[in-house]
């Protein structure tokens, strides 16, 4: 019972931590979260007092209120987001109405109007995600519209530019001659050829420089790895290899392989009485998880760390290993 209550309380604390990372701090201090924290404190106190069943009930209540707090926070944040978007859409729509956007952009204006209306109904019905979608549709509809005065000015400017361009074109056609056109073409072709040659030379230079840099990096990396490997091997020769993290079982008939004898191995634990630690970590790998006396040959066992020591690789019987700390 004590272990079960401790697990419940621990799981509750993890659960209570979730909204703190995903929600605004200002929303977290709500009625549900306050009750959740209060019940959590009661669960801990009653647990410490040895009242494990009472502690479990308080833990359950704390979890229920934590879930309600999470729902409340999500709904509040969704409402705020939707409200901001709807306000932005209404502001943009009011501006469009004042600028008589409906005359130049009747379709966009109508779409925005209907979207705001639909979004408002959804917001009033607490369908905040739907309201947010319609607010964005309204903003998108009016995103690229321009005031009527600006459109008229732009149209006049474009008309003047068009007429000027036509006049220039007629003048160029009048004074242009075939000879000038041919010379211009030759000049353009020559310029294009030289530019292509220059680009090719630059690309070749960059490629050669990049290849040289890559070769240098590869050589440096190879030298670094070789030095590290040499240092590692030298350390292994001096201190012995890092203790193994795995052990492949041989046979009982020849080698007397069992959890007791494996735990006795100096490279494992050097103590046969620690066989249960080895068994607990590997009971899912043996034919009968509740029978530690049956271990099949070729089974690869995991060797858990005993005192925080570093372990890696598969045990090799002919290798010198470092002693346990």
Curated annotation (Swiss-Prot):
Entry superkingdom? Bacteria
The ARKLEEQRIAAQKAQEERKRAEE repeat ranges on this chain: 167-189, 198-220
Where in the cell? Cell outer membrane
- Ranges for region Disordered: 176-224
Its placement in the membrane is given as: Peripheral membrane protein
Function, please? Tmp may serve as a porin or transport protein for large molecules.
What gene does the UniProt entry assign to this protein? tmpB
Which InterPro entries does this one have?
Bact_Kbp
EAARKAAE repeats span which residues?
A: 159-166, 190-197, 221-228
Task: Give the protein name, as stated in the record.
Answer: Treponemal membrane protein B
Which GO cellular component terms, listed alphabetically, does the Swiss-Prot or TrEMBL entry include? cell outer membrane
Keyword annotations from UniProtKB, A to Z: Cell outer membrane, Membrane, Repeat, Signal
**Family, similarity comment:** To T.phagedenis TmpB.
Signal peptide extent: 1-24
Per-repeat ranges for EAARKAEE = 229-236
Residue runs in coiled coils: none
């Amino acid at each position: 019972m004590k272990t079960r209550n401790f697990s419940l309380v621990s799981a509750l604390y993890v659960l209570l931590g979730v909204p703190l990372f995903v929600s605004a701090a200002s929303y977290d201090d709500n009625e549900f979260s306050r009750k959740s924290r209060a019940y959590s404190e009661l669960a801990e106190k009653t647990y410490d007092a040895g009242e494990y069943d009472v502690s479990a009930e308080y833990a359950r209540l704390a979890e229920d209120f934590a879930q309600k707090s999470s729902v409340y926070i999500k709904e509040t944040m969704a409402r705020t987001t939707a409200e901001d978007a709807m306000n932005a859409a209404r502001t943009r729509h009011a501006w469009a109405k004042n600028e008589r956007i409906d005359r130049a952009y009747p379709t966009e204006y109508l779409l925005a109007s209907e979207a705001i209306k639909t979004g408002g109904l959804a917001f009033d019905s607490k369908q905040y995600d739907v309201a947010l979608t319609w607010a964005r549709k309204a903003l998108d509809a009016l995103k690229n519209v321009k005031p009527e005065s600006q459109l008229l000015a732009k149209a006049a400017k474009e008309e003047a530019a068009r007429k000027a361009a036509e006049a220039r074109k007629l003048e160029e056609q009048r004074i242009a001659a075939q000879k000038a056109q041919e010379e211009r073409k030759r000049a353009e072709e020559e310029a294009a050829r030289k530019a292509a040659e220059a680009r090719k030379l630059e690309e070749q230079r960059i490629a050669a420089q990049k290849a040289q840099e890559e070769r240098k990096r590869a050589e440096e990396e190879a030298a670094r790895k070789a030095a590290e490997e040499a240092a590692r091997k030298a350390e292994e020769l001096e201190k012995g290899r890092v203790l193994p993290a795995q052990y492949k079982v041989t046979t009982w008939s020849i080698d007397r392989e069992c959890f007791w004898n494996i735990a006795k191995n100096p490279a494992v634990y050097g103590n046969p009485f620690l066989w249960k630690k080895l068994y607990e970590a590997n009971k899912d790998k043996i034919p009968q998880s509740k029978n530690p006396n049956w271990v099949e040959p070729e089974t690869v066992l995991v060797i858990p760390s005993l005192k925080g020591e570093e372990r890696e690789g598969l045990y090799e019987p002919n290798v010198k290993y470092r002693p346990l700390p």
